[in-house]
């Protein structure tokens, strides 16, 4: 049975953390780039699989609501304690959560997300999470796209002022009241008949696309890419 301390923490994460994330996002002067495709699919009621690096997770709920204008999304979170905390925050935004990762429960989470994608919900995945290596796309997101026949839409952001945690991914913590870029990439479709070699090729392409987006976002800000 959860202790009073644990119950209090879960309550804070669900009710207060989402408001703080929204406040942080609104305080930053963001320029949004290439939002047309995800917005058009939203107007048509079509799903997307949003794909972003683990260290850029913090503001993604804010960006999603700004660009898609809804809360119909399922986010994959690991079965670790950290994943439980992240789940609380996501549920506070009104999002659904599928618990699983490359190391624990991934197959179950993928099946759940495929079903939800086919029913019209969006999905969100960190392809290098939950343990890395940083900026390396793991197989799950490509398989998810293939099984659901829904395109992957890569997303990144960068800000002029930021701190970083001493974690494996060097998690980005944006500073308020600075300038930022939020960028959406071109959709990546995975053919339903793709074999293992083709899936590997598409993983490599997605990884290259996402790193190029990171560099471009940094360049537009006049910052140094990591």
Report the location of each language-model feature.
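Non-catalytic C-terminal accessory region of glycerolipid acyltransferases
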Residues: 1-27, 92, 96, 107-226
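A short, well-structured juxtamembrane/interface segment
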Residues: 22-46, 59-60
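Residues in well-ordered beta-strands of folded domains
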Residues: 31-33, 51, 76, 183-185
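Short, well-ordered alpha-helical scaffold segments within catalytic/effector domains
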Residues: 35, 57, 83, 107-114
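Short amphipathic alpha-helical segments and helix-helix/interface helices
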Residues: 38-39, 87, 141-142
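Short, flexible, glycine/charge-rich loop motifs used to bind or transfer phosphoryl groups or to couple energy/partner
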Residues: 38-41, 63-64, 113-115, 171
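Catalytic core of membrane glycerolipid acyltransferases/transacylases, capturing the structured
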Residues: 44-104, 164
């Amino acid at each position: 049975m959860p202790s009073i301390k644990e119950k209090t923490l879960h309550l804070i994460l669900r009710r207060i953390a989402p408001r703080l994330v929204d406040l942080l996002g609104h305080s930053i002067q963001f320029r949004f780039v290439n939002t047309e495709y995800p917005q058009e699919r939203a107007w048509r009621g079509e799903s997307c699989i949003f794909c972003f690096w683990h260290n850029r997770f913090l503001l993604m709920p804010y960006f999603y609501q700004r660009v898609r204008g809804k809360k119909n999304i399922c986010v994959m979170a690991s079965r670790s304690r950290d994943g439980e905390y992240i789940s609380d925050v996501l549920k506070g935004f009104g999002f659904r959560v599928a618990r699983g990762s490359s190391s624990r429960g991934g197959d179950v989470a993928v099946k759940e997300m495929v079903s939800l994608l086919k029913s019209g919900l969006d999905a969100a995945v960190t392809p290098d999470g939950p343990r890395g290596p940083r900026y390396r796309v793991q197989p799950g997101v490509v398989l998810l796209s293939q099984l659901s026949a829904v395109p992957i839409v890569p997303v990144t952001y960068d800000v002029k002022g930021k701190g970083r945690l001493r974690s494996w991914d060097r998690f980005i913590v944006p500073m308020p009241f600075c300038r930022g870029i939020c960028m959406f990439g071109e959709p990546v479709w995975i053919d339903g008949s793709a074999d293992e070699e083709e899936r590997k090729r598409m993983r490599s392409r997605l990884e290259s696309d996402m790193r190029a987006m990171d560099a471009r976002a940094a360049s537009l800000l006049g910052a140094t890419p990591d």
